[in-house]
C-alpha cells in the first residue's frame, strides 16, 4: 500500500518508544497532542497492544493521513480535530506526547506558505481554514519596530531591525509581497555577501518568527505545559520533542519548576549521528520526559 502523502519519518522514535516502556501500566490511554501523520502513535500502538489513542490535530490533511496510517488499529484510535490547547480528555492518560515541529509535508506544500524554498502565498497558518491572520496580513499590520522586535524575539535573528526596515520599505513601494519566495529574497538581501555557503538559509529565522507569531506557537505550548499534568494519571508521563531553543527552554523550565512533575531526562535526548544522516530533520530535535508525581 502506498504511503500517505503526509507521511514522514518520526524523529527520536527510539526515545519515544523507550518512554512507552516506562508507563505505569501497559493498558490505558495515550494522548498524541500533535498527531501529524501518526508516525509516533503507530509505533506506540504496535509496541503496546493495550494502548488506546486519542490523537489531536487541527490540520485536516494531517488528520486524513493519520486516519489512513492508523486504520489497522481500528477502534483503539480516536482522532479529534482540535488544537491541543483547547482540549480536555475524557479520562486520565498514561502518557501525553507532543512533537512540536512543522512536518516535512507541511513545508513541502508551497500553498501552505511555510517554505522559503518553494514559492507560495504568505499564509503560514497551521489551520489553513481558520480565521486567524496570515503572515502577509501580520507584516502589513505591524509597525517597523514591532516587526523587528517580533523577528528578534521569535527568530533570535540578529539582523532583525535591518530585515524589518527592508520589509516595510518594500511594502511601501510595491505593496504586498507576491509570495514566500519574494519575502525570502528580500530577507537574504539584508545579509552581507559570503564566500562559503551558509549553514542555514538567511530567511530561516525570519520565517520561523512569523510562523510562531501567526500560530501563537509559544502561547499554545505554554498552555499545553500547564494542562498536560492534569491530563495524566499519577505516574503518567509527558514527553515533548522540540526543535528550537525557544521551545526547549520552556519545556525544560516547566519540567523543572512544576511541582506536579518529576524530571526523567536531566538533559535532552538528541539524535544519533546515524539518525541525523538518515533523517536530517532530526538534527535540531530534543526530547524531554517527565513523570507526574504519585499522590501521597
Swiss-Prot record:
The keyword Transferase applies. It holds the Pfam family Methyltransf_5. Keywords: Cytoplasm, Methyltransferase, rRNA processing, S-adenosyl-L-methionine, Transferase. S-adenosyl-L-methionine binds at residues 38-40, 57, 84, 99, 106. It is found in: Cytoplasm. Gene3D superfamilies: Putative methyltransferase TM0872, insert domain (1.10.150.170), Vaccinia Virus protein VP39 (3.40.50.150). It comes from the Bacteria. One of its GO terms (molecular function) is rRNA (cytosine-N4-)-methyltransferase activity. It catalyses: cytidine(1402) in 16S rRNA + S-adenosyl-L-methionine = N(4)-methylcytidine(1402) in 16S rRNA + S-adenosyl-L-homocysteine + H(+). GO terms for cellular component: cytoplasm. The keyword S-adenosyl-L-methionine applies. NCBIfam families: 16S rRNA (cytosine(1402)-N(4))-methyltransferase RsmH. Specifically methylates the N4 position of cytidine in position 1402 (C1402) of 16S rRNA. PANTHER family: 12S RRNA N4-METHYLCYTIDINE METHYLTRANSFERASE, S-ADENOSYL-METHYLTRANSFERASE MRAW. Belongs to the methyltransferase superfamily. RsmH family. This is Ribosomal RNA small subunit methyltransferase H. It comes from Parasynechococcus marenigrum (strain WH8102). The lineage of its organism: Bacteria, Bacillati, Cyanobacteriota, Cyanophyceae, Synechococcales.
